[in-house]
């Protein structure tokens, strides 16, 4: 069986059914045609991200995506600064 890939937006919207709209995990999983353990993982990830915890998996919320991009950019700039300091 081929593994299905879901977009971050789909994961977020699916998890929001449970977190924001008070669906049960089982009902949301059935409505979105995903496994119960998959839905449980997405709900946990969304709740963690909303509490400000750094996700171990791919980020769900747009804010977490932006934070990840900014952290990478900051790391690159800091590395460039270190290289320039050594040259001077």
From Swiss-Prot:
Coiled coil: none annotated. GO terms for biological process: DNA transposition. Pfam families: HTH_Tnp_1. Belongs to the transposase 8 family. InterPro entries: Homeodomain-like_sf, RD_transcriptional_regulator, Transposase_8. SUPFAM superfamilies: Homeodomain-like. Involved in the transposition of the insertion sequence IS911. The keyword DNA-binding applies. This is Putative transposase InsN for insertion sequence element IS911B. The gene is insN2. Keywords: DNA recombination, DNA-binding, Transposable element, Transposition.
